[in-house]
Amino acid sequence: MGRSIQSSKMLYILILIVGVSTLYFVIPSVTIAEETPQTFLTHTGLVITTTGDVIDPIGYDGKALDFDPAKFMKSFDYGQVSVLEDGTILREFYITARDDQIMEVSPGVFYNVWTFNDSVPGPTIRATEGDLIRIHFTNEGSKPHSLHFHGIHKAEMDGVFESIGTGGKFTYEFYAEPVGLHLYHCHVHPVEEHIAHGLYGAYIVDPKEGRDSADEFVFVLNGLDTDFDGENNFYAANTIPFYYQHHPIEISTNQKIRAYVVNVLEFDAVNNFHLHGTLFHHYPAGTDSVPSGYNDMLTMSQGDRQILEFSYKYPGLYMFHAHNTEFSEKGWVSTFLAKETADDFDNKVEYDDII
């Protein structure tokens, strides 16, 4: 009886092994469908071919968003200006939050951005010290949002505990102080998610006596976690990776350049800014009229701001970028094209030759 049971078990195991072996030899004969390359026309007119999945913004239940980094870096929103009876300058701004928009951040790569006034970053708000700032905020998003400004203001204007629900409105009011380069962003939890998706912008407070003449630019340093794994896939100055590498920023030699640099990078503890071919005076947060140093390299933590002032002695193409190699190779690399005059320069080195 025992031997019979053992024999039956051995026969069962033998059949199972043979069956598995048979399956093993059958599997290779199965034809696996190959991925079919797709041709895709981006909104910029570039045609790409890919075997991966392409998210078509037209078919996505959201609003496609175009963003121009060249325009953004030179745009300052001074608000609607009026004068109160006591002589105070009132600046009124209208900011709308949305969270259903799609931006093509790289050819064929689309990202669900959350925006202030249909832009990432949001508008650069600018005022003079002592001005009364009044911001009419509307939330047209599907999630609660708010506005939190760095600077000096009353607790009820801090935008932390009073989140604004869908369809809600709130008016923020405070005086522009102190002088410097500040930051504003959504402060609804999880704050990391709201900032990473794009709800932030720069806020500049000028001194009453004004600033020296300069060619001014705004650079908001950010990243994009396009696969939502808590790590950035792209890095940039003003959202679009490699933009200013392919579209050099034209400046004049011996002209003072003033760069307002704001770091809003999430998921990475620090970011940095390295300038080629010259050095800059830097003013942390721009709150002091005396520069804290003269360098070609800055390291910034999350939320840090710096005002940089510099000029180029010699004409040519100069790079500025993150000295963290990973960041620069994933998009945070840009260029200045210094010309002898703003209108006419016989460039000895063609940009296309360098690429």
Where are these regions (language model features)?
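Copper-binding active sites and cupredoxin-like electron-transfer domains
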Residues: G2-I355
